[in-house]
Amino acid sequence: TAQYEAAEQDLLVRVSQAYFDVLTSEDNLELVQAQKKAVGEQLASAKRNFEVGTATITGVRDAQARFDLSNAQEIAADNDLRIKRLALDLAVGLSNAKPKRLANNTKLIDAPTEDVSIWVTQSEAASPAVRQAQLGLEIASLEVNKANAGHKPTIDAQLSYAGARNLNGTATTALSSSNHVFSPSAAVVLNVPLFAGFTTMYRVKETVALEDKARSDYENVRRTTAQATRTAYFGLVAGLSQVKAYEAAEASSQSALDANKLGYSVGVNINIDVLNSQSQLYQTKRDLAKARYDVLVGNLKLRQATGTLTPADLQPINALLAP
C-alpha cells in the first residue's frame, strides 16, 4: 500500500504541474504578444516623431530592435506552449486538453500556520517512502532472528503408536484388541546443536549485514524526506511572499510606464525609457503569473512530502478555476 500511495501522490503532483505549466505558457505567450503590440505602437510613434523632427533616429532604432526581439520571444513562447500541451496530454491520457484558467481576482491559499517542525514530524510518520523503508528494516531484523535460531537448541514433541500381534493370548498391560496389542508413546526431545558447519554462521553474518544496510537506508530516507519537507515548506512560504511582492511591483511598474509615456509625449523622456518600462511591466506580469501557479503546486508538493496528499486536496484548487 505504501508503494501505491507514493505512486498516487506522484501522479497528482505531476498532472498538476503539467496543468499549470500549460497555463504559465499560455500567459507567457499572451503577455509577449501584448508587449509586442505595445512596442509596435511605440515604434510607430517614434517614426512619426522622427519624421517631424521631434525625435532622433536613435529612438527609432531602439524601438525597432525591441520589436524584433519581441518577434523572437513570441516564436519561443509559442513553441514552449506546444511542448507543454503535449506534456499535459501525455500526463492525462487525452488529446488537446484544455485547462481552465484561474478566476480573476482569485485569492490564493493561506500560508501554513504550523511550524516547519510539525510538518517534518508528520512526514516521518506518514510518508510512504519512510514507512516502506521502516518495513524493510523490520523484515531484515526478523531475518536476523531467524538465522540466529540455527545456533539455539530446539525442542521437538514426538508421538508414536505401535501395534503387535499377541500369539499366545496372554494378558498385557497395553491396549489390546483380540490378538493384537497397541502401544502408544509420547516423548519430548531436546536438540542441542554443537556444530552444524559454517553455513549457519555465514547466514547470520549475511543477515546482520543486510539489517545494517536496511537501517542505513531507513535513516537516509527519513533524512531525505525531512529535507524535502523543509524545502517544500519554505518554498511555499516564500512563494506566497513573492506573489505579494510581484503584485506591488506590477502596480509600481504600471505607474512608471504611465509616467515615462507622459514624459516622452512632452519631450522630457526618450523612447528607450518607455521601452524599458514596458519590458519591466510585462516581465513582472509574467513573473507574477508563474509565482501564483507555483504556490498552488507548492502546496501539493508540501503535502506530498508529508505523505498526506490525497485527491481531495485538489478540490480547493478546482474552486479557484474559472467556470
Language model: regions and residue ranges:
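Small/polar, glycine/serine/threonine/aspartate-rich low-complexity segments that form flexible
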Residues: 102-113, 145-146, 158-203, 316-323
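Amphipathic alpha-helical coiled-coil segments
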Residues: 7-30, 41, 48, 84, ...
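Bacterial Sec-pathway N-terminal export signals of envelope proteins
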Residues: 103-138, 193-194, 219-222, 321-323
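Transmembrane beta-barrel architecture of outer-membrane proteins
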Residues: 17, 62, 154, 183-185, ...
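Membrane-embedded beta-strand positions of outer-membrane beta-barrel proteins
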Residues: 133, 155-159
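Metallo-beta-lactamase
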Residues: 77, 128, 291
